Curated annotation (Swiss-Prot):
Family matches, as PROSITE patterns: PROTEIN_KINASE_ATP, PROTEIN_KINASE_DOM, PROTEIN_KINASE_ST
Gene: SIPKK
Protein name: Mitogen-activated protein kinase kinase SIPKK
Active site: 192 (proton acceptor)
Superkingdom of origin organism: Eukaryota
Keyword Nucleotide-binding: yes
Family membership noted in the UniProt record: Belongs to the protein kinase superfamily. STE Ser/Thr protein kinase family. MAP kinase kinase subfamily.
Signal sequence segment: none
Induction line: Induced by tobacco mosaic virus (TMV) infection and wounding.
Pfam family, one: Pkinase
Organism, as annotated: Nicotiana tabacum
Keyword Zinc-finger: no
Record-level GO BP terms: defense response; response to other organism
Length: 357
């Protein structure tokens, strides 16, 4: 791959906010509207095609939760788009995560947030973080999410440095079930699978979160071609700007598992003490160099084979989530009673939760 040939039109940092006023997305009643999506202080609703032009107003009675029901406990995450607070329901005492995103941002980012709300509204899976309700008020979107008290897999990895194979298999099995649901039931490519987007809790659950850059396809064989997501975990076909499918998420999963097993990101910079000069250098390495592999002298043949099945350079050669669930690396531990809950809690309190927006 020639220097400078890498997706020349890509913008690797957010452009300054555009001139489109937020009022473009608001109805006369102050409801945030994007196509079939309506969000106001009373909740969120997806309207039918016949209602898009003249949708009815969301009523408070449509939803069981409202922002006034929650009391802020502390800030547990910050990002460019806003903050995440730990909140407690005043009447039940239950804890939730409240993600608050200011909407005075560029139009494309508002579109991403609207897409995230649609996916949150329609997804119901034990391996995907639950979104209970969303609101729009005072220029901000607020999303009530399931609180995962173990933080993210990235937080956990900072504490334990590496994760043994048997625990990785149990973690991976849950992630694969979540990906199977997204890919085959909802036709969604996550497009930003990474350790910080996998959340854990004290009972051993592992759940996928953050659908801000996800794509919804028309079918299980559909393709996308938009360049979004975290560059480190991006598949070669996505970096090259070509069409890609659900197996781009499988590439990302392979890198995540290899990082968890070895304790380091699979692609090392030429000068280890200096890091990558820029993101283009990293992406050119991902495209030009052979795919990373698990050192056979450190890991089982089953794990090495699993990683290889995930990080094939040609997406057609990668196994699907469903196929990977039958891989020996996953099935070899089926008879063992692997207590992820105890393993997660043994490392102590989480460093943070939902640290990226």
């Amino acid at each position: 791959m020639k220097k400078g040939s890498l997706a020349p039109n890509l913008k690797l940092s957010l452009p300054p906010p555009d001139e489109v006023n937020l009022s473009k997305f608001l109805t006369e009643s102050g409801t945030f509207k994007d196509g079939d999506l309506l969000v106001n202080r009373d909740g969120v609703r997806i309207v039918s095609q016949s209602e898009v032009e003249a949708p009815s107003v969301i009523q408070p009675s449509d939803n069981q939760l409202c922002l006034a029901d929650f009391e802020a406990v502390k800030v547990i995450g910050k990002g460019n788009g806003g903050i995440v607070r730990l909140v407690q329901h005043k009447w039940t005492g239950q804890f939730f995560a409240l993600k608050v995103i200011q909407m005075n941002i560029e139009e494309s980012m508002r579109k991403h947030i609207a897409q995230e709300l649609r996916i949150n509204q329609s997804s119901q899976c034990p391996y995907v973080v639950i979104s209970y309700q969303s609101f729009f008020d005072n220029g901000a979107i607020s999303i009530i999410l399931e609180y995962m008290d173990g933080g993210s897999l990235a937080d956990f990895l900072k504490k334990v440095k590496t994760i043994p194979e048997r625990y990785l298999a149990a973690i991976c099995k849950q992630v694969l079930k979540g990906l199977w649901y997204l890919h085959h039931e909802k036709h969604i490519i996550h497009r930003d699978l990474k350790p910080s987007n996998l959340l854990i809790n004290h009972i051993g659950d592992v759940k996928i979160t953050d659908f801000g850059v996800s794509a919804v396809l028309a079918s299980t064989s559909g393709l996308a071609n938009t360049f979004v997501g975290t560059y480190n975990y991006m598949s070669p076909e996505r970096i090259l700007g070509g069409a890609y499918g659900y197996r781009s998420d499988i590439w990302s999963l392979g890198l995540v598992l290899l990082e968890c097993a070895t304790g380091v990101f699979p692609y090392s910079p030429p000068q280890a003490d200096e890091g990558w000069v820029n993101v283009y250098e990293l992406m050119e390495t991902i495209v030009d160099q052979p795919a990373p592999s698990a050192p056979p002298d450190q890991f089982s043949p089953q794990f090495c084979s699993f990683i290889s099945a995930c990080v094939q350079k040609d997406q057609k050669d990668r196994l699907s989530a469903n196929e990977l669930m039958r891989h020996p690396f996953i099935t070899m531990y089926d008879d063992l009673d692997i207590d992820l809950g105890s393993y997660f809690t043994s490392a102590g309190p989480p460093l943070a939760t939902l640290t990226e927006l």
